[in-house]
Amino acid sequence: INNDGDLSNVQSIGTNDGLWIDAPTDFATTSIGDHTYVIIASADTDSLSVVEVAPDGSMIVRDHLMDSRETRFGGVASVEIVQSDGKTYVVAGGADDGVSVLLLLEGGLLIHRASIEDTIDYSLDNISALAAVQRAAGLEIFVASSS
């Protein structure tokens, strides 16, 4: 937003810049040290992308992670970021009937830490929204299912 209240486009990013996604479904932002990151979820490409945003508004793709057998964020609909004990966690879920927890490192690298899949004990079918908070005993993840 300019000083006179008008909006202006500082920069956009896409496939020519290494952001190989289709139809982003959610995003969340965080800072680690002096660096600002946007985590972009895309259901159509079953992926999470990390984009660093510089102070001048320029952007660069730092990581791009595809869903696999070990993760549960295929068809990702929701992404949440929570910081705990000096670490930054990314929580993602969607149509793959589960939740993935990833660690975001300084430099923008995502590391898969854990996944929980839908079972008879959990209602994680078609996740539509989630939230995560830090508590004394660790992280609590709240999940809403659309089915």
What is each of the regions a protein language model found here?
Residues 1-147:
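Feature marking well-ordered beta-strand scaffolds used for ligand recognition
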